[in-house]
Regions:
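Extended repeat-based scaffolds of very large eukaryotic assembly and lipid-transport proteins
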Residues: 6-80, 84-89, 96-168
Length: 168
């Protein structure tokens, strides 16, 4: 009876180990957890949602070790923020391995919102199609976008080959 009812509502995030993550990052993660990922412009009035600013704040203010730890958080939105934050850090060296890890990280999908459209996708689809812009089958990159992530052509090809193995 009771155990079954309680276990059906269990969230893995309840027992997440926050050691090594500062309180202000934890507080922002807890708020960001249910907001999905936003391109920055949503809705009819093309407003920038607070979730976009929150995501940017976490990526900018979390340390490399905090972001690495957050790639293990049991929520797709937070994992995506952590992966993207590491990819965007110029000093982070293991980007290819990290992205390959993200490609195989399929347990938690995310909700991505852009313009008036929201859609569910895997973390890898968000990273490859809307952060890295390396798949020619994906939406075009924004005007003026350059690959500023330090990935060589062979690294991008390796990432793309692994990404294309995942059923969409």
């Amino acid at each position: 009876g009771i155990v079954v009812v309680l276990s059906s509502f269990y969230e893995k995030s309840w027992i997440y180990d926050w050691n090594g993550i500062r309180q202000q990052i934890k507080d922002s993660v807890k708020v960001a957890e249910y907001g999905g990922i936003s391109s920055g412009v949503v809705g009819i009035a093309a407003k920038r949602p607070k979730q976009f600013d929150r995501r940017v704040w976490i990526m900018k203010n979390a340390t490399e070790s905090e972001l690495l730890k957050l790639t293990e958080y049991p929520n797709g939105t937070i994992k995506s923020i952590a992966y993207e934050g590491l990819i965007r850090k110029p000093e982070f060296k293991n980007k290819t391995d990290l992205i390959l890890k993200a490609i195989s990280d399929t347990e938690y999908p995310i909700e991505f919102q852009s313009g008036c459209v929201g859609t569910n996708m895997n973390i890898s689809e968000y990273l490859v199609d809307f952060v890295l812009y390396i798949d020619d089958k994906s939406p075009p990159s924004p005007i003026g976008f350059e690959n500023t992530f330090g990935l060589s052509e062979s690294e991008r090809n390796k990432i793309l080959a692994e990404y294309r193995k995942i059923p969409s």
